[in-house]
UniProtKB/Swiss-Prot annotation:
This is Protein YdaY. It comes from the Bacteria. Encoded in the Rac prophage.
């Protein structure tokens, strides 16, 4: 289950991440002849920042996620840390969450427009 991408916390943190990416790109000379991929460290992983943001502010709960305990599957309560681990293991879920969050935001905007148009 996810939240709208119009979520203020998500949008604010996403803007910070985008500015961070721009600064990293500038310092690494991305897009120029001076760019050297070997100078990019693992700490600079943009994916980790974006996954963290989605897990904290877009993904709000899950169903059907569990772990084996003594041979029995036990449901796991959602936490951002568990969400981050899941998204890193299954990056395709990140894109599904973004698509769902965008769809929710679009639906909210459509509702607002429909309300404004009503006499």
């Amino acid at each position: 289950m996810s939240r709208s991408s119009d979520n203020d916390q998500y949008r604010s943190r996403n803007a910070l991440i985008r500015r961070h990416i721009e600064k990293m790109d500038a310092s690494l000379h991305v897009g120029t002849k001076e760019f050297d991929i070997s100078k990019v460290s693992e700490v600079d992983s943009v994916d980790d920042l974006l996954i963290d943001n989605a897990a904290r502010y877009l993904l709000k709960d899950w169903k059907g996620v569990g772990e084996l305990v003594n041979g029995v599957e036990v449901a796991l309560e959602y936490t951002a840390e568990r969400g981050i681990a899941l998204l890193k293991q299954n990056p395709e879920l990140y894109w599904q969450i973004l698509a769902e969050a965008a769809s929710i935001a679009q639906g909210k905007e459509q509702q607002k427009q429909d309300t404004i148009k009503k006499p």
